């Protein structure tokens, strides 16, 4: 699978062939748990005027709403936006008045309990159960359980400094995988590990969306910051989407500027 940096793209070719542009949220469109900044809002809404856009995030709908949906401009073309939180295990569309749920795949109570127990036990054993946290460490997102070592609302600077080489998260991933071989366990953001049913990841989101739209997977571009084979954006590429790597929202702003400069027709 080929993943290209945003700065290496042939933008003319991309704009000619892509029928939908998908985006990760945290550290792609916005800083973790923070709303999109005005420059991003302006460009994201402008992109909706030109093409179909998908938002595929590991976060739950509440976070997606606060970071993106609540800050869209009043005239944004919400009908062009496909919202797929928790890695596509939920799917929402705008019905003219609100974001309506199309489908949801939620974990059973027994599975939630088993995953939560494994995450806490191994985090403690590995010395990752930090004393200073900002919010809950373990969050049930319905179709995904997420462990956040510093809590759900930790400052971005603290999260960035916690596991710069990803060894802490990967150690927890491997330990939980051994307990729950039937589940998919992946490193998420700076401090997080996501656990979901096998097959319910961003590859699933890409397959569901491209089937819904009646397009090929390679007619979808997916932009994210976690594009290594162990990252939670990489499954989108494994499903056939064109992978584009950014390092932060500032890169994404420049990517959007380049895309918007090449669009000169109304939404398809």
Where are these regions (language model features)?
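Non-catalytic pre-domain segments flanking phosphatase-related domains
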Residues: 1-23, 39-46, 69-71, 267-268
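Asp-based phosphoryl-transfer active-site loop
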Residues: 14-34, 55, 83, 206, ...
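Structural motif
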Residues: 20, 52, 219-221
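Short loop/turn segments at strand-loop or loop-helix junctions that form parts
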Residues: 21-26, 85-88, 141, 148-152
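Acidic di-acidic motifs
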Residues: 24-26, 198, 224-225
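Active-site phosphate-binding/coordination module
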Residues: 35-134
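Conserved acidic, metal-coordinating active-site core of Asp-based
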Residues: 130-221
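Acidic, Mg2+-coordinating phosphoryl-transfer loop and its flanking beta/alpha structural elements
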Residues: 147, 206, 212, 216-258
């Amino acid at each position: 699978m080929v993943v290209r940096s945003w700065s290496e793209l042939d933008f003319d070719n991309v704009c000619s062939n892509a029928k939908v542009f998908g985006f990760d949220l945290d550290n792609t469109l916005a800083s973790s748990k923070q709303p999109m900044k005005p420059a991003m809002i302006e460009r994201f809404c402008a992109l909706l005027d030109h093409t179909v856009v998908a938002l595929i995030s590991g976060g739950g709908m509440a976070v997606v709403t606060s970071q993106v949906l609540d800050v869209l401009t009043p005239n944004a073309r919400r009908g062009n936006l496909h919202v797929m939180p928790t890695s596509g295990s939920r799917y929402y569309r705008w019905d003219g008045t609100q974001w309506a749920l199309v489908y949801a795949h939620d974990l059973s109570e027994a599975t939630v309990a088993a995953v939560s127990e494994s995450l806490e036990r191994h985090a403690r054993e590995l010395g990752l159960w930090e004393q200073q946290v900002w919010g809950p460490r373990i969050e049930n997102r319905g179709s995904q359980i997420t462990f956040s070592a510093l809590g759900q609302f930790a400052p971005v600077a603290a999260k960035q400094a916690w596991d710069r080489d990803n060894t802490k998260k990967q150690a927890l991933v491997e330990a939980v995988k051994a307990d729950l071989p039937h589940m998919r366990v992946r490193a998420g953001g700076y401090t997080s590990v996501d656990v979901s049913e096998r097959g319910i990841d961003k590859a699933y989101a890409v397959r569901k969306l491209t089937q819904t739209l009646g397009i090929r997977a390679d007619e979808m571009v997916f932009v994210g910051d976690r594009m290594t084979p162990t990252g939670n954006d990489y499954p989108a590429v494994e499903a056939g989407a064109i992978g584009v790597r950014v390092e932060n929202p500032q890169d994404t702003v420049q990517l959007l500027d380049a895309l918007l400069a090449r669009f000169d027709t109304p939404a398809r």
